[in-house]
Design a protein with these regions (language model features):
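WD40-repeat beta-propeller superdomains and closely related acidic/aromatic-rich repeat-like regions
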Residues: 20-319
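Positively charged n-region of N-terminal signal peptides that target proteins for export
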Residues: 1-5
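Bacterial N-terminal signal peptides
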Residues: 7-17
Length: 319
């Protein structure tokens, strides 16, 4: 199950313990919102931000102008925070009952076939033609956006796929699976390229470097791994933060990774990790993690989306 990482209160000691103000978080722009947004995503290309509110409304902001659009999807149930993806033309969302909706930037909605499973993760290919879906009960799936049909499903020994991404060239799909393996597939036909062994505990998320050569993988072990994308071989590991990591994002410009850390007992946000991969130390940003509702990147580097109030968001650059 993908965890909501921003709606529950935390003790101050949990939030700021081990935080090291070694990096700078600079406000980039403010976004007004007509409803309280609980999850956000930086769209592929970094020009827009999409968000989801508790009435299942889909918000879209242009970062250059701050202009907001609000779309309705008529989905049958709540949208999991991880079941949101967008690029320069399309927003994809999925409900906990398995409904998938595609919304273009003019608000036209098209629904895909019902998956009948809780959707916990989504990612669009760089060209926007393919959608990969992770559910709570099954391996990764790849769907064709134009036809709305599923092209293939992956496989696991047991368990589901927790997180998946498509390579920048659109040729490979990488999945972190509940049976502790990291798997790579040929995006065209779903053929398994490799199943690389992981740690004793399951990985939750994967991010792909801008050149497609390196993966950042993290999960229940509480550390971030760099892996060679061609083989799955571990290249380097960060130190452990002592808590599970549920999301990772690699910078497209410098060797750094952002990580969402949850408290292992409460599964509430416990920190935003920052790893300079030239070292082994996984540090934490000196910010309140319960304000973070999304992370991603643009052409210049890593970005956070934070909730300043129910009516205002802040997009901030991590330097």
């Amino acid at each position: 199950m993908r965890i909501v990482f921003f709606s529950a209160p935390l003790l101050v000691s949990l939030v700021f313990a081990n935080a090291i103000p070694a990096q700078t978080v600079k406000p980039m722009t403010k976004l007004d919102t007509t409803r309280e947004v609980y999850s956000a995503a930086i769209c592929n290309g970094g020009e827009n931000v999409a968000g989801v509110d508790r009435e299942k409304g889909i918000h879209l902001w242009n970062l250059a102008t701050g202009q907001q659009k609000l779309f309705k999807t008529d989905l049958d149930a709540q949208i999991d925070p991880g079941a949101l993806a967008c690029d320069r033309k399309t927003i994809a969302v999925g409900s906990i009952h398995g409904a998938v909706a595609l919304i273009d930037f003019e608000g036209r909605v098209r629904k895909l076939a019902e998956l009948k499973e809780e959707i916990i993760g989504m990612a669009l290919s760089p060209d926007g033609h393919k959608l990969i879906v992770s559910t709570a009960n099954s391996p990764v799936q790849l769907w064709d956006v134009a036809s709305g049909s599923r092209e293939w499903s992956g496989s696991t020994t047991f368990g589901n796929t927790n997180g998946a991404r498509i390579s920048p060239d659109g040729k490979s799909v990488f999945a972190t699976d509940g049976d502790t393996y990291v798997r790579a597939y040929n995006a065209t036909d779903g053929k398994l390229v490799y199943a690389a062994e992981g740690d004793l505990l399951e990985p939750f998320d994967v991010s792909v470097s801008a050149d497609g050569r390196t993966l950042a993988v993290a999960g229940a072990e509480g550390r971030v791994e760099l892996r060679e994308s061609a083989s799955g071989r571990i290249l380097k590991k960060s130190s452990s933060c002592g808590n599970p990591i549920f999301l990772v994002t690699m910078s497209p410009t410098v060797p750094t990774v952002l990580a969402l850390i949850l408290d292992e007992m409460t599964l509430h946000p416990a920190g935003i990790g920052y790893w300079n991969t030239n070292t082994t130390e996984l540090k934490q940003l000196a910010i309140d993690p319960k304000t973070v509702i999304g992370m991603g990147s643009d052409a210049k580097g890593l970005l956070l989306v934070r909730q300043e109030s129910p009516a205002k968001l802040s997009v901030e650059r991590v330097e």
